[in-house]
A protein has these predicted regions:
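N-terminal phosphate/diphosphate-binding loop that engages ATP/GTP or pyrophosphate donors
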Residues: 1-5
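Helical "lid/switch" subdomain of P-loop NTPase nucleotide-binding domains
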Residues: 6, 21-24, 60-63
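A generic alpha-to-beta junction signature in SAM-dependent methyltransferases
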Residues: 6-7, 32, 67
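Short acidic/histidine-rich motifs immediately flanking catalytic phosphotransfer sites
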Residues: 8-11, 70
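Switch II (G3) loop of P-loop NTPases
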Residues: 10-22
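Switch II of P-loop NTPase G domains
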Residues: 20-32
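Acidic, Mg2+-coordinating active-site environments of NTP-dependent enzymes
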Residues: 35-133
């Protein structure tokens, strides 16, 4: 686990928290105690141990329960579970930042993505500022 590679003096770490069943994200994020979380989408990738997308959404929402108070969660506004996840976050006093490829009013709007064999270029709008990566 990459968490064991984090040194005491490190100011931040980017950690992926995976899951195969309900409770796994909760257990891992109790250890990590994140300031910031990202849920990219709710999809059938984890369906083998769940009965529905609702179950997957509930399991992924476990990260929100362990974000420090006043922390942040970044959510995909294009996902059908956006409002479900946002509601949980707001109840926990977690700031929600949205991203979208469809809704130009989201906090982070993905205007265009260009890919080829050697690189990827992403054009995003954050508030009124357009950036290219």
């Amino acid at each position: 686990m990459s968490l064991f590679n984090v040194k005491k003096n490190d100011k931040f770490a980017v950690l992926e928290v995976g899951m195969d069943k309900a409770g796994e994200i909760n257990n891992l994020t109790q250890i990590i105690k994140p300031n910031l979380g990202v849920i990219t989408n709710i999809s059938y990738a984890h369906i083998k141990n769940f009965k529905s997308l609702d179950g997957i959404a509930r399991a992924k929402s476990e990260i929100i329960n362990n974000i420090v108070e006043g922390g942040k969660i970044i959510l995909n506004q294009d996902d059908e579970y956006f409002n479900f996840l946002k509601k949980i976050a707001l109840k926990k006093n977690i700031h929600v930042t949205s991203f979208s490829k469809k809704n130009s009013l989201s906090d982070i709007f993905i205007k265009k993505i260009i890919t080829n064999k050697t690189n990827c270029k992403i054009f995003i709008k954050i508030k009124n500022l357009t950036k290219t990566f």
